[in-house]
């Protein structure tokens, strides 16, 4: 299990090890350290969050397609809270991405912010993206949450979708049909237009590239967006995709907030232990609470 978690970092953190050698940047870390690293922002009560682990959100499929649900401490059985669904990026097949420190801590942050944090492992992979399969997993995860909302303390009509890194294309699943229960969308250092990405172009048709580019679904009625950008992100074409997305969002008069970390590396929420990282993480949590109609505890 530990080795699988280490392997999955190849895509998620492929450029940070190089970038970290630059002056004034975080020190170079081993893969084992990066696997365990939590988000650089903490809130009181994170250690008291109730975690429902390894739920099978699909009736069949790979054994690693599991979900963890993070519930606020002290929440009564009858109480309901909005759900925040955290979507990981591309990983080698069989890697339990939900078990990485970054997603475990984001789940806890959501829970102590009076929301239900959801992390799950899906089939978005490397080197072949398997976008259609991953989209099916995302739809299955949402269906599972809504069908089991009462048992999971979830308000099924208040959901936020959060994507990271190579998981950006899956934002298109929520944007395409614009379901009323998806109240807001968040993207952290994520691909938002894969039509210019060489790895994606090498494996997918032009039709699929457009279908899984969130930029194609921008409109004035798009759910409110929060975009976090790493200024020193070294993943080829990633920041270009964000910049194109932001320009198009403005042109379409969409509701959007953009938070840029000028010194931020890819995965700055674990790599850059500085005030700007914490400001952006706090702002993202505030955005989620506001859009989901939750007050801070």
What do the predicted segments below correspond to?
Residues 25-79:
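N-terminal cap/lid segment of alpha/beta-hydrolase-fold proteins
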Residues 75-81, 89-129, 194, 235:
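Short substrate-entry loop that stabilizes the transition state in hydrolases
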Residues 87-89, 229-230:
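The conserved beta1-alpha1 loop
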Residues 140-210, 214:
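Primarily recognizes the serine-hydrolase "nucleophile elbow" in alpha/beta-hydrolase
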Residues 184, 190, 195-251:
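The feature captures the conserved acid-bearing segment of alpha/beta-hydrolase catalytic domains
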């Amino acid at each position: 299990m530990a080795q699988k978690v280490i392997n999955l970092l190849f895509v998620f953190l492929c450029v940070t090890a190089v970038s970290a050698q630059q002056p004034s940047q975080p020190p170079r870390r081993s893969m084992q350290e990066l696997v365990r690293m939590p988000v650089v922002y903490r809130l009181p009560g994170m250690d008291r969050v109730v975690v429902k682990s390894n739920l099978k959100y699909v009736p069949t499929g790979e054994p690693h397609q599991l979900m963890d649900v993070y519930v606020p401490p002290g929440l009564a059985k009858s109480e309901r809270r909005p759900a925040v669904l955290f979507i990981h990026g591309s990983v080698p097949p069989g890697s339990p991405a939900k078990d990485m420190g970054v997603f475990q801590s984001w789940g806890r942050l959501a829970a102590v912010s009076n929301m239900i944090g959801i992390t799950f492992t899906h089939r978005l992979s490397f080197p072949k993206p398997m976008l259609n399969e991953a989209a099916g997993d995302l739809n299955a995860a949402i269906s599972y949450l809504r069908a089991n909302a009462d048992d999971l303390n979830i308000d099924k009509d208040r959901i936020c979708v959060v994507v990271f890194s190579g998981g950006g294309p899956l934002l298109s699943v929520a944007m395409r049909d614009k379901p009323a229960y998806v109240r807001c969308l968040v993207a952290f250092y994520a691909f938002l237009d894969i039509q210019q990405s060489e790895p994606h172009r090498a494996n997918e048709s032009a039709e699929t590239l457009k279908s899984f580019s969130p930029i194609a679904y921008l409109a004035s009625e798009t759910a409110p967006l929060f975009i976090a950008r790493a200024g020193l992100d070294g993943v080829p074409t990633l920041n270009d995709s964000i910049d194109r997305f932001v320009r198009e969002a403005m042109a379409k008069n969409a509701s959007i907030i953009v938070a840029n970390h000028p010194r931020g590396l890819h995965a700055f929420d674990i790599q850059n232990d500085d005030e700007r990282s914490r400001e952006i993480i706090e702002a993202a949590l505030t955005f989620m609470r506001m859009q989901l109609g939750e007050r801070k505890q």
